[in-house]
């Protein structure tokens, strides 16, 4: 398992959980954020300094909802793409992919499009905010174009009554036979 976590606030929580659960030999942390370019320095904008917090944005000035994002913390960090990591044999092609990055899911998919058709990839779980229509549509179109079909989408029941998060779902796609 390769876990990509560029946020310094979340890295501490992730590494602690890996250690507590004795997964040090099973999970490798990569602090490099993914996006649609092979490599480059971009801004990582963070909502705050909360450990385990979300609502961060890499390489863009919008948040999970597509609206302008005003970060409380911002710094430059090196990012790369799935295409670059796989083309240079830094990583092996995965069987399963989970993407939950608060607004740039489509950019990460675009940065991995060279390999998405590979038969080794069986399934992709991706969190999408349906109120961010362009990002949701782009993500679904990239996956369909690369031979994935939607199995289901769901979210926590608590999201049903949340004005802020009611349009956020985990979509599960599987590779067509």
Provide a role label for each language-model segment:
Residues 1-177:
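Phosphate/nucleotide-binding beta-alpha loop and adjacent structural elements of enzyme active sites
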